[in-house]
C-alpha cells in the first residue's frame, strides 16, 4: 500500500491512534536496507532481512535500477503492534498489510506468522520502494506519481511479487467474466467500483505475458512523464482502449469455458446468508453451531460497521448481533479477515477475537442475551488467530503469534493459562478439534517438501494433525500441488473437510482418514473463499454435520449451507487434475518471463547476513520537507512598498515518534517578522507537545491633515505565545487533554505624514500608546469521537467535547465549553443534532475596553462555532436601516456566554452510488434541512429570555454593559458541496424569525458540523 505522512496537529475532535505499548526498537544494516525491529521478533526479522535482499536483487533486475542509499524497513511483530505505529499517520485497519511512504521512503509492515505471506507482502511493498526511488530522484524532475491511478501502482506491485499464477485473482476474474463486468482501463481509472489490486494484477500479467515483463516497468517509467494513456502508445504501441478490448477477450476465453462446466453459485447449496445474485456483499467467516441450528458470521450490513451476527442456519433470519464496535467501550474492532470464532459445546456461548488496548482479546458472547460475558488476554502472545472451543468446553485452541512466528496454543479456561503446543518457525494456523478432543487439525507449511528456512523456499499449505497430549505431528497432503487449508472434522472424526485450489478452483473437499482417499464436495464456478486466499471460509457442525461455507460471487461474499447428507462428495485422484485455471492470461506468455523466472528461483540474490550487532534505534531528527519558500512584493497601498515571504522546515525521526516544525514569515519591516517552533512527541501513550510563536498583524489607514498632507497610520498587534499540551487517549474514541500556556499581546502605532512633494516624517499620536496584555491559561478537556464521516459531514455516531480553561492575567475568568453532537443514520438520510454552550464565567459585564474581545462570544460570525445561520454580522450591516444610520446595534448576537442548538436532516443528493441518491462522484453534494436557535447573554441576563422579533439592528449592551437574553432562531435549506476534495462549501437560504429581513442567503467554507 502506498502512503503519505503528515505532521500531527491538535484536533478539536478526531479519533485517536493509541500507543498502548513501548517498543524498544533496535537497528542493523544489510547491503540495501536499515532494518528496525524490537528484540522479541529478532529471529523472524533476520529471516525477513534476507527476504528483502533477495527481493532487492529481483526488483533491481526488473526495474534496471539500483538504490543510491539504504532504505529503512520497519517491522512489527504482529498486526496489533503495527496498528500503533507512528511512522504512518492516521488509523490503520486490519486489511492494511503494509505501507510504503514517500517522505523517508520507509517500508512499515507487520510480520504475518506465515513466512510465505510475509515474503509476499514485503515483495509487494518493495515494488513501491522502487517506484518511489524512480519518482523522487532529482534526475527525474517532472516525473508525476500523483497522477497514476491506483490500479496501475498496486497492480504492478502485486504482479511483480505474486506473478501470473494466482487462484485468488483468477477467481475474481472468472466471476467478473461470468457476470460480463470486466472493466476497461478507463473504468479502472475512473471508478472505485473495481478492486485495484486484483484487476490491476490481471492487467499487468497480461502486459507482461504479451510484451515481456520489462514492458511493465518501462510502462511505469514512461507513465510518470507523459501520463498513463500516452505511455501505452509510446511503450507498447497500442492504445489503452485497444489493450482493454484485447485483455477482456483473452480473459473471457481463458476462464469461461472451464467455468461453464461447473456448478453455478446459485445451485451449489442453499444460500442462507446473503444473495449470491446480489453485488458487493460481505458475509464471511461462518461458524455453525454444534447442533447446526445457527450460524455466526461477520457481515457489513451498513456503510460503516463490520459486525458479528448470529442467524438461523436454515432461514438466515438474524437472531442476535453484537453491539456495534463504535459504541462498545470494550474493544476497538473485531478481528475478522484472518479469523473465525467458535461455539461452546452447548451452543450457548460464542467466542470471537477483538482488537483491544493494543492486543487481541478472546471475548465470549452470550448468544441468547447478546451480552459479552468474558474478556481474556493471553499473556506472552502478541496476536491471536482462529479460535476453536474444545468438545469438553474447558479449553480454547488458537494460533498465536509471538515475535512474528505462529504456533499452536491451548488455553485452559478454568486455570486461565495457555499451553504452547508447537515452537518453531513453521506456519501453524486455523486449528480445529477432533470430536474426541485428542487431536487438533490445522493448516501448516511443515512436512515433506515444506518450507526450507535456509533457502527460504516455501511449502504450500497442507493439513497437520497434532496430538494435544504428546505434541506428535503428522501432515496430510491430499493433493501434491496447491493450497489445502481450513480443516474441519466430520462429526464421527473419520474425515477432514478442507478447501483446496489444486486445479485452480477453490472448492471444498473431504479427506477420509481411514481410506486415505479424497472426495470433491463442491465444484463451484467461482470459488469457496474468504477475503484473502487464506481466510477461513468453511465450518462443519460438530454434532449434526451441517456444512456452511462462504462463496465469492458478483464481487461479494455470501454464505451457503448444505445438510450432512450432501457433504460426502465424489472421489478424486490424489494427483489432482492438470489445469491452467489459476493462470492469468495469456496462459502461454510470448514475452520475456522474468517474473516467473525469479519466483521459481529461491537462491539467486539470497545471501547470509553475517554477524549482526544491533544498536539502539536513533531518535535523531531528519529534515522531512521544506515548505517552499515564497517571496512577494507590493508597491503602493496603505503600507507603501512591501516585501513579504515565508519558509517552513519540517523534521521527524525515523520511527515517527517526534515531529519538529519551524516556520518563519516576513511581511514588510523587521517588526513584521514572525514565526514559530512546534514540537510533538508521541512515543508513549501520553502524547505531548510544546510550542513558541510570535505573530505580528498590521492594520493601516490613510487620511489627510488640514493642510492637505497625507497621513499614514499603521497599527500592529504582536501576539507572542508559549504553550505545552498533553493528550492521554483512553481508547480510539476518547481522550483527556491537558494544556498550559501564556500569551502576550503587544501594541504599536506609528504615524507618518507625506507632503505633496514626497517628503515624509514620523509624528507622534498622543494617547495612542497601549500597555501590553498578558494572559495565562490552563485547560482540561474530555473529548470523544465515535463518528463516521461522509463526504461533507458526519453521517453516524457522535462527538463531544467538555472543556474548562481558567484564564488569568489582564482579565481573570474561566472559560467553559460543552459541545455534544449525535448523528443517526437511517439509510439514506442522517438526522443530526447538536447542543453547544460556551461561557466565560467570572468575566463580569462588558467594560468597554480591549479585553472585552477576549470574553465575547458571538452568534453572528460564520466562522465561529456558535453561528446561527441567517444572522451574520456582514448581512445585518448591509440592511438599509444600518446603512442609513451608519451604525448598527447587534448586541443581541453577542455576550460573555452563549448557547446554541441545531438540528439537520441530511440527504445525500450526489456522490458515490453506495452513498447517494444520484451517482455523481465528482461533486458530492448533500441537501440539508436545518433549524438553528441561539442565545447570547452576560452573567445576569438569562432569567427572562425574550423571543421578540425584528430587534436585530436595534439592541446593544445597556449602560451597565450587560446584554439581555434574546434568542435568535432560523430554519431553512442548504447545500453542502465537496469541491474536488479540497474544500467543502455550504450555501444556505435561511428564514430568520428575529430580523426584519425574513430571508437571508449566505455561503460558508467549512465542513458540516
Q: Residue spans of the language-model regions?
A:
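Juxtacatalytic substrate-recognition/specificity segment
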Residues: 10-149, 166-168, 186-188
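Beta/coil-rich, acidic/histidine-enriched accessory regions frequently appended to metallopeptidases
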Residues: 12-27, 191-194, 218-332, 336-341, ...
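Active-site-proximal alpha-helical
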Residues: 35, 59, 151-166, 174-240
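A flexible loop/linker signature enriched in serine peptidases of the S9 family
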Residues: 278-281, 298-309, 325-336, 351-363, ...
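Blade-terminus and WD-like Trp-Asp/Gly-His loop motifs, strongest in beta-propeller folds
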Residues: 286-294, 341-349, 386-395, 431-439, ...
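Repeated loop/turn-to-beta-strand initiation elements of outer-membrane beta-barrel proteins
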Residues: 371, 472, 517, 655-661, ...
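Outer-membrane beta-barrel initiation region
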Residues: 563-685, 767-795, 911-913, 937, ...
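C-terminal outer-membrane beta-barrel translocator/porin domains of Gram-negative envelope proteins
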Residues: 691-697, 703-705, 711-715, 722-725, ...
Amino acid at each position: 500500500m502506498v502512503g503519505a505522512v503528515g505532521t500531527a496537529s491538535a484536533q478539536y475532535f478526531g479519533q485517536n491512534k493509541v500507543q498502548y505499548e513501548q517498543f524498544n526498537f533496535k537497528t542493523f544494516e544489510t547491503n540495501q536496507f536499515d532494518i528496525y525491529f524490537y528484540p522479541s521478533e529478532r529471529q523472524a526479522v533476520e529471516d525477513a532481512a534476507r527476504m528483502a535482499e533477495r527481493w532487492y536483487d529481483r526488483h533491481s533486475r526488473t526495474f534496471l535500477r539500483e538504490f543510491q542509499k539504504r532504505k529503512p524497513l520497519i517491522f512489527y511483530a504482529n498486526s496489533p503492534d503495527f496498528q500503533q505505529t507512528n511512522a504512518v499517520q492516521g488509523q490503520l485497519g486490519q486489511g492494511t498489510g503494509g505501507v510504503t511512504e514517500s517522505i523517508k521512503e520507509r517500508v512499515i509492515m507487520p510480520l504475518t506468522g506465515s513466512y510465505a505471506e510475509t515474503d509476499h507482502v514485503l515483495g509487494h511493498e518493495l515494488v513501491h520502494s522502487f517506484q518511489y526511488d524512480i519518482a523522487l530522484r532529482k534526475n527525474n524532475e517532472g516525473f508525476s506519481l500523483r497522477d497514476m491511478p491506483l490500479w496501475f501502482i498496486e497492480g504492478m506491485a502485486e504482479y511483480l511479487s505474486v506473478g501470473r499464477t494466482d487462484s485468488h485473482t483468477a477467481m475474481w476474474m472468472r466471476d467478473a467474466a461470468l457476470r460480463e463486468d470486466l472493466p476497461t482501463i478507463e473504468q479502472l481509472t475512473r471508478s472505485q467500483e473495481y478492486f485495484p489490486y486484483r484487476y490491476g494484477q490481471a492487467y499487468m500479467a497480461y502486459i507482461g505475458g504479451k510484451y515481456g515483463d520489462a514492458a511493465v516497468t518501462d510502462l511505469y517509467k514512461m507513465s510518470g512523464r507523459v501520463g498513463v494513456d500516452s505511455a501505452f502508445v509510446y511503450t507498447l504501441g497500442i492504445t489503452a482502449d485497444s489493450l482493454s478490448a484485447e485483455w477482456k477477450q483473452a480473459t473471457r476465453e481463458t476462464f469461461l469455458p472451464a467455468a461453464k462446466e461447473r456448478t453455478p453459485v446459485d445451485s451449489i447449496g442453499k444460500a442462507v446468508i446473503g444473495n449470491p445474485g446480489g453485488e458487493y456483499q460481505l458475509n464471511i467467516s461462518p461458524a455453525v453451531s454444534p447442533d447446526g441450528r445457527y450460524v455466526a458470521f461477520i457481515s457489513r450490513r451498513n456503510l460503516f460497521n463490520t459486525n458479528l451476527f448470529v442467524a438461523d442456519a436454515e432461514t438466515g433470519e438474524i437472531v442476535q448481533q453484537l453491539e456495534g464496535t463504535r459504541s462498545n467501550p470494550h474493544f476497538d474492532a473485531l478481528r475478522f479477515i484472518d479469523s473465525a470464532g467458535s461455539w461452546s459445546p452447548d451452543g450457548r456461548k460464542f467466542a470471537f477475537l477483538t482488537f483491544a488496548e493494543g492486543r487481541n482479546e478472546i471475548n465470549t458472547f452470550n448468544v441468547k442475551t447478546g451480552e459479552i460475558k468474558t474478556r481474556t488476554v493471553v499473556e506472552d502472545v502478541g496476536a491471536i488467530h482462529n479460535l476453536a472451543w474444545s468438545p469438553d468446553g474447558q479449553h480454547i485452541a488458537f494460533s498465536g503469534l509471538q515475535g512474528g512466528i505462529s504456533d499452536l496454543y491451548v488455553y485452559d479456561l478454568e486455570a486461565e493459562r495457555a499451553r504452547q503446543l508447537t515452537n518453531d518457525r513453521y506456519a501453524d494456523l486455523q486449528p480445529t478439534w477432533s470430536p474426541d478432543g485428542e487431536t487438533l487439525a490445522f493448516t501448516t507449511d511443515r512436512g515433506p517438501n515444506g518450507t526450507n528456512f535456509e533457502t527460504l523456499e516455501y511449502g504450500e499449505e497442507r493439513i497437520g494433525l497434532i496430538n494435544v497430549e504428546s505434541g506428535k505431528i503428522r501432515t496430510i497432503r491430499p493433493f501434491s500441488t496447491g493450497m489445502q487449508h481450513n480443516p474441519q472434522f466430520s462429526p464421527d472424526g473419520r474425515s477432514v473437510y478442507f478447501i483446496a485450489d489444486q486445479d485452480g478452483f477453490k472448492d471444498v473437499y473431504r479427506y477420509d482418514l481411514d481410506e486415505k482417499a479424497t472426495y470433491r464436495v463442491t465444484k463451484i464456478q467461482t470459488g469457496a473463499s474468504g477475503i484473502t486466499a487464506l481466510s477461513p471460509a468453511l465450518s462443519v457442525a460438530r454434532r449434526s454435520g451441517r456444512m456452511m461455507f462462504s462463496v465469492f460471487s458478483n464481487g461479494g461474499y455470501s454464505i451457503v449451507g448444505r445438510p450432512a447428507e450432501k457433504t460426502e462428495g465424489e472421489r478424486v485422484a490424489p494427483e489432482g487434475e492438470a489445469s491452467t485455471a489459476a493462470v492469468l492470461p495469456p496462459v502461454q506468455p510470448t514475452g520475456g518471463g522474468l517474473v516467473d523466472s525469479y519466483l521459481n528461483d529461491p537462491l539467486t540474490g539470497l545471501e547470509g547476513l553475517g554477524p549482526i550487532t544491533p544498536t539502539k534505534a536513533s531518535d535523531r531528527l531528519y529534515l522531512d520537507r521544506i515548505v517552499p519558500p515564497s517571496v512577494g512584493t507590493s508597491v503602493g497601498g496603505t503600507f507603501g512598498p512591501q516585501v513579504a515571504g515565508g519558509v517552513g522546515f519540517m523534521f521527524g525521526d525515523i520511527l515517527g515518534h517526534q515531529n519538529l516544525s519551524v516556520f518563519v514569515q516576513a511581511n514588510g519591516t523587521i517588526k513584521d517578522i514572525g514565526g514559530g517552533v512546534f514540537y510533538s512527541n508521541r512515543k508513549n501513550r501520553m502524547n505531548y507537545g510544546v510550542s513558541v510563536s510570535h505573530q505580528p498583524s498590521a492594520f493601516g489607514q490613510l487620511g489627510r491633515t488640514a493642510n492637505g498632507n497625507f497621513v499614514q497610520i499603521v497599527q500592529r498587534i504582536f501576539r507572542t505565545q508559549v504553550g505545552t499540551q498533553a493528550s492521554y487517549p483512553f481508547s480510539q474514541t476518547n481522550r483527556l487533554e491537558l494544556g498550559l500556556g501564556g500569551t502576550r499581546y503587544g501594541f504599536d502605532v506609528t504615524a507618518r505624514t507625506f507632503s505633496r512633494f514626497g517628503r515624509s516624517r514620523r509624528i507622534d499620536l498622543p494617547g495612542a500608546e497601549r500597555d501590553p496584555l498578558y494572559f495565562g491559561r490552563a485547560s482540561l478537556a474530555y473529548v470523544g469521537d465515535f463518528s463516521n464521516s461522509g463526504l461533507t459531514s458526519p453521517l453516524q455516531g457522535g462527538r463531544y467535547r467538555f472543556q474548562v480553561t481558567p484564564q488569568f492575567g489582564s482579565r481573570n475568568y474561566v472559560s467553559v465549553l460543552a459541545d455534544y453532537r449525535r448523528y443517526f443514520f437511517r439509510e439514506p438520510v442522517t438526522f443530526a443534532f447538536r447542543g453547544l454552550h460556551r461561557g466565560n464565567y467570572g468575566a463580569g459585564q462588558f467594560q468597554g475596553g480591549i479585553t472585552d474581545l477576549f470574553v465575547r462570544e458571538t452568534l453572528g460570525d460564520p466562522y465561529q462555532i456558535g453561528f446561527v445561520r441567517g444572522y451574520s454580522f456582514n448581512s445585518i450591516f448591509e440592511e438599509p436601516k444600518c446603512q442609513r444610520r451608519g451604525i448598527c446595534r447587534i448586541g443581541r448576537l453577542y455576550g460573555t456566554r452563549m448557547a446554541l442548538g441545531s438540528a439537520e436532516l441530511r440527504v445525500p443528493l450526489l456522490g458515490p452510488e453506495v452513498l447517494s441518491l444520484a451517482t455523481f462522484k465528482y461533486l458530492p453534494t448533500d441537501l440539508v434541512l436545518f433549524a438553528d436557535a441561539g442565545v447570547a447573554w452576560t452573567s445576569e441576563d438569562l432569567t427572562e429570555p425574550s423571543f421578540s422579533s425584528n430587534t436585530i439592528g436595534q439592541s446593544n449592551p445597556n449602560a451597565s454593559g450587560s446584554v439581555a437574553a434574546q434568542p435568535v432562531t432560523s430554519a431553512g435549506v442548504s447545500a453542502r458541496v465537496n469541491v474536488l476534495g479540497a474544500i467543502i462549501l455550504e450555501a444556505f437560504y435561511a428564514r430568520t424569525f428575529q430580523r426584519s429581513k425574513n430571508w437571508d442567503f449566505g455561503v460558508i467554507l467549512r465542513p458540516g458540523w
